Amino acid sequence: MNNVSMRELLEAGAHFGHRTRFWNPKMSEYIFGSRNKIHIINLEKTLPMLSDVTNYVSRLAANKAKILFVGTKRAAQDSIREHARRCGMPYVDHRWLGGMLTNYKTVRQSIFRLKELKEMKEKGLFNDMIKKEALMLTRELEKLERSLGGIENMGGLPDALFVVDVGFEHIAVEEARRLRIPVIGVVDTNNSPDNIDYVIPGNDDSMRAVDIYVRCVADAILDGKNSNTVGRVSSDSEFVEVTSNSNEEEKSGE
């Protein structure tokens, strides 16, 4: 399930934590040591924990669960957007709006507005408006697309959150915990792993390292979805139809 090697993590700098003076003591069990006042993360712990995460999300995906990808810092935005789209999961890559989970009913109204504006634009209705009105609606559409475009088709609260940098995204984590939504999080040496259900100890500032974590999660989700499809096809193909004119069993594949 986990297709990443120790060498790949090392080359991406996944083992580099933060400066020792900024460390969180609760991360001590994941720290190998320090070099030049920088904490070194023990990748021998990261690798199996990343494997646990991929196994978990694969099981979720096989059961058609929704996993919300969250990464709004510069090092995570591109990877979050690219891989979430690739595996068909909702994502937040711009700015976490307070209440995005805990006040989802209100957020859903904004999503309806986003869909309404997109439909109006696709039908060319903006072209029939006066320039000022069309410009205002275009700006509103762009703002909503930037903030909510990634969760436009989420269709309700997610079944789990996958977060890059649990400190930076602490509001998202707090909202998920309040709603008892499981949290998967990349945790660097300056943050606490408390209240994170599935911890990935690792550098959350390296774009290459972040891309590895997110890619692995997305790959596992796709594997889970595929296993669900294969299982369904296999189950269908095992259906036996018995006819009154024959004693033979025929397998009917749909």
From Swiss-Prot:
Disulfide bonds: none annotated. Keywords: Ribonucleoprotein, Ribosomal protein. GO terms for molecular function: structural constituent of ribosome. One of its GO terms (cellular component) is cytosolic small ribosomal subunit. The keyword Ribonucleoprotein applies. CDD domains: RPS2 (cd01425). One of its GO terms (biological process) is translation. This is Small ribosomal subunit protein uS2. The gene is rpsB.
